[in-house]
A protein has these predicted regions:
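Extended, Lys/Arg-enriched charged tracts that mediate electrostatic binding to polyanionic substrates
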Residues: 115-197
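Short, surface-exposed, low-complexity cationic segments
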Residues: 194-211
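Conserved small/polar residues in nucleotide/adenosyl-binding loops
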Residues: 256-257
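Signature of lipid phosphatidyltransferase scaffolds
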Residues: 226, 230-241
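Intrinsically disordered, low-complexity terminal regions enriched in charged/polar residues
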Residues: 211-225
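Alpha-helical multipass membrane-protein architecture
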Residues: 241-248
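Short amphipathic alpha-helical segment within the helicase RecA-like ATPase core
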Residues: 253
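Extended, helix-rich architectural segments
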Residues: 1-122, 130-141
Length: 259
């Protein structure tokens, strides 16, 4: 072959390749990729600028609703529809503009979007758990909890590739915290109750420290967990950090101050 499969061209002879499934090529290497990606973000200005510029250009002020109800279908006038649209926007702002929409009670909804997108770029995927919590003086109970990708991981850090029981749950397969059924459909996520890389998590984490969260509520059918990820291969369950392909090139840049 005269193309990429050539075994005789001088430029290709030294290419040591190895193929695998998405698990071998991606999921099994994610911990190293995430940690190196975050390290580059914190210590290499080129990486920092790339991530922040993309976040600003994509998220900007954040997604905002633009209600446009179908007044013809509802049988109401344009003026009535406009009043309802304005009321919907006001009610959404009542929830979104305050940090009470954040389960951590720090960011408003638009700042949460920036946080989630930054995590997606740095870690390959970003996660949000939708919770309900009554708070005095707050009319809406919905809370958004952003979870860093590291906390979505397999119990005791061991992927399950054959049927077994964990914490009184029968599971078919768990890869990097994503549980699938016998047909390969995602049905649940396993969340560690603390960050696995925290100083208090170095030892002593057993399967009991993980909580199984169903992807969809049994009664409501509502999504319990939102995952921001871009798949690149069929069968892929976790995302790849944006900086992964250029980490090797960024490494020498971090030493430029020594020259």
């Amino acid at each position: 072959s005269n193309y990429g499969a050539s075994l005789h061209k001088k430029s290709m002879r030294g290419w040591m390749w190895h193929g695998g499934s998405p698990k071998e090529d991606i999921e099994d290497n994610l911990r190293v990729l995430r940690e190196r990606s975050r390290d580059a973000y914190m210590g290499v200005p080129l990486a920092t600028g790339a991530i922040k510029t993309m976040r600003t250009n994509v998220v900007c002020g954040g997604l905002t609703p633009t209600p446009q109800i179908d007044n013809a279908f509802l049988g109401i006038s344009d003026e009535e529809a406009q009043k309802i649209n304005e009321q919907i926007a006001r009610e959404f702002a009542l929830w979104a503009n305050k940090p009470t929409c954040d389960a951590d009670r720090i960011d408003n909804f638009y700042m949460l979007q920036q946080l989630a997108f930054t995590g997606f770029l740095l870690n390959g995927d970003s996660w949000a758990v939708l919770q309900n919590k009554k708070t005095p003086g707050v009319p809406y109970d919905l809370r958004v909890r952003i979870i860093e990708a590291d906390r979505i991981c397999s119990p005791a850090f061991m992927d399950i590739l054959s049927p077994t029981d964990i914490n009184e749950h029968h599971v078919e397969k768990i890869v990097q915290g994503v549980e699938t059924d016998a047909d390969g459909m995602v049905i649940a996520y396993w969340v560690c109750d603390r960050h696995p890389l925290a100083s208090t998590s170095v030892t002593g984490l057993t399967a009991s420290h993980w909580t199984r969260v169903e992807a969809y509520g049994k009664k409501t059918g509502r999504q319990n967990v939102l995952c921001l990820m871009q798949r690149e291969r069929a069968g892929q369950l976790r995302g790849v950090p944006l900086l992964a392909p250029v980490l090797e090139s960024l490494k020498p840049v971090s030493y430029t101050h020594l020259r």
